[in-house]
Amino acid sequence: MKTQQKQSGFYLLSDNIDAFVARFALAISAKKTLDIQYYIIHNDASGQYLAYAILQAADRGVHVRILVDDINLSGRDIRLKMLSQHDNIDIRIFNPLSNRDWFRNLEMIVHLDRAGRRMHNKVFVADNAVAIIGGRNIGDEYFDNRNELNFVDLDALTVGPIVDDIGSSFDDYWNSCWATPIEQVSRRHVVKNQLSTIRAKLRDRWQRARNSQYFKSIQRSDLTKKIIAREIPFVWANARFFYDRPEKLTRNKPERTVHLGPHIM
């Protein structure tokens, strides 16, 4: 891959299969770190395929940090807590609700001002060298793996100096007061051998997927071919990365001076 000094490289991921391939490729090729930040991480087929790749990375010695918003974790934080039993996997929940049972919805209504402050960032960074940013969460509907519903969205595979800024944004959220270690959030008890159980289940799910039509689509993916040929056609340009800092969530009133809406109207 040819690099350009001081410029960043961008490759747009408009195809849903390519978007999955890019994330899977980063997970299986990471050597030191994986930083993963999402609003939604579904425990469906695509989510489990990526979880298996991430768990394999941790087994290789890669330090994995996962930051996920709490809004869609009702009853599902136990699987994340199982993964966090791995010595190389740290998981934090963004703005977690106190109630983890059916009182959760009541808390959402009573404390809407706080509970409504969510994290929509979507970041996947490998080795502080390659990153994916964009609109897709983790789930079948984002990667063309559902029959009844699939979303159209856009991500960018990025390399170069901008990855440092993307990594800094992850660190800001990871270290913020809104991010709580999952061990302090989930009250459900897990033991070390459950990690072996979930590893076996994820391995079995991936092995069965290798005979599926979806796996054939992955093999035929345009990005898969480019990765194998080591010929990803990055567009190189000067770039700046803008993001909302987590401190914005502590403000009671929006800063209208930085909003474009009033000026347009």
PLM feature spans:
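Charged, low-complexity intrinsically disordered terminal segments
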Residues: 1-122, 126-265
